[in-house]
Amino acid sequence: LLEWFKRPEEPVSKPLPKSVIVAALVLAPLVLAFIAYSRPWYFNQSYLGGFLVFELMTAAVWMYRRVFFVLVIVAFLFAGIELPVGSVWTAGRWAILGVGALVGSSIMLRDRKYRIGWFHVLALFAVLAALVSAAVSRYSGLSSLKVLSLLTLFIYAGTGARVSAAGRENRFFAGLLTGCEVFVGAVGAAYLAGIEVMGNPNSLGAVMGVVGAPILLWGVLVSEETFPRRRRMALFVLAVYLTFASHARAGMVAAFISCGLLCMVLRKYRMLINGVVVLAILVAGAAVLRPEQFSNTVAALTDTVIFKGKDPSEGLLGSRLSPWQAAVDSIHKHFWFGTGFGTSDNGQDATESLGKFATVVAASSEHGSSYLAILSWVGMVGVLPFVLLMLVLLWKVIETVVWMRRTGNPYHPAVPLAMVILAGILHASLEDWLFAPGYYLCVFYWSVAFIFVDYVPALATAESRSVLFWRSRAIQPRLGEVAPSR
């Protein structure tokens, strides 16, 4: 027995013989071919797409902080654009968001260094208010699913999105800026080729006016080298052009106010004046060289952009009067608890199939404003947490703008996010996407909103103009010094 104990230990895992490896390489294609012949439904688009999503999700979980935020945004974006890949992501996006929320929550519970404040408490109360409205809704099942999607989004935004940015701000914001460049360039190339990838003009105006234009303008301001600055300026001009080409007034207003305010508070008056002068020269040149065509263009733009094809006697917002009136009527009819979060009482039979992974027309309607939509959905009883949530965001934006005006410093993580939040608040007053968790812009907006709330408290210790809190070139650890308060 003693000799047996003295024997050298054998390795726990031995390398596989070469013959086994060769046999596996030979037999694997044959097995796959047999399965494809005997069970061809395993190789249809849905199964293969689901397998691809599973692979991507597994890899993203392995590199959670670096990759998962991008995967979530891409999944919801692909589910909403007019491309063949959209069908695979319609259901897969919810699995990705759920896994992201679960893993993000686990990381936060493990690290125990992330701050929970009033904003996060209000988000929880907003979900509870939505759940109450779903309980009394005509379409209780569908509304409950939408509440679940809102809860999942808020959990991911409050955990996974914050984890993706905290402690690695340089990489996160460099990636955010690069992602905007790629996205705007790709959308511009697609529209040049005649492909309307965003589906409808309002969506194009929304993403360009709320996200593309303010972030790219900020990228121009923080660029330290000539070529990146010129590239971002060209893409910013493209984003502004696409916003105007969409004829979406909400997108134009959001882009104009957010970008104009960014230049004003950072004292970039020369850039603002140069932009106005260039635009005036282009307009004047077109009027002089082709007066008749210019006159026709102005008349067409007045009809399609300002009045949206409605009678001018109805006023500037004539196209919004009908959905606004319908929303007000719905609020009067369901005053206290609303029609149920994410649903409208259109008289559709509640026993019929109303969809599980995407919104259907039978249980929804246009409200013309995100704020009228949420009031119609949850009623007077449930709207207070949502109102307070938006007021907290607006106050954080004001704090950031005051700091920007005092220091003139664009090198802080809160600066671009504040402009996106402000643009979203303005845009949502004319479009009802702000509380639609299946919409890619809603997912992006609330993700960066939770990140933004983390960085505003750090402004109190970031008073010096000479300190650069973010650099567009070398990845530096200095921004970690102004990481969110924990």
Where are these regions (language model features)?
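A juxtamembrane structural motif centered on a specific transmembrane helix
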Residues: L1-A24, V222-R229, W403-V415, A428-L434, ...
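Alpha-helical transmembrane segments of multi-pass inner-membrane proteins
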Residues: L30, F54-A60, V127-A134, T152-R267, ...
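Helix-loop-helix junctions and helix-breaking kinks within/between transmembrane helices
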Residues: F34-Y47, P84-G92, S140-K146, E196-A206, ...
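N-terminal hydrophobic segments of proteins, predominantly signal-anchor/transmembrane helices
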Residues: T58-K146, G185, E224, P228, ...
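Membrane helix-loop boundary segments at the extracytoplasmic
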Residues: V74, G80-G86, S369-V378, N409-V453
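A membrane-periplasm/extracellular boundary helix in multi-pass inner-membrane enzymes
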Residues: Y241, A245-S246, C263-D311, Q325-K333, ...
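Long extracytoplasmic/lumenal interhelical loops at the membrane interface
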Residues: K310-Q325, D329, K333, F337-V378, ...
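Hydrophobic transmembrane alpha-helices and their immediate junctions
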Residues: V378-L422
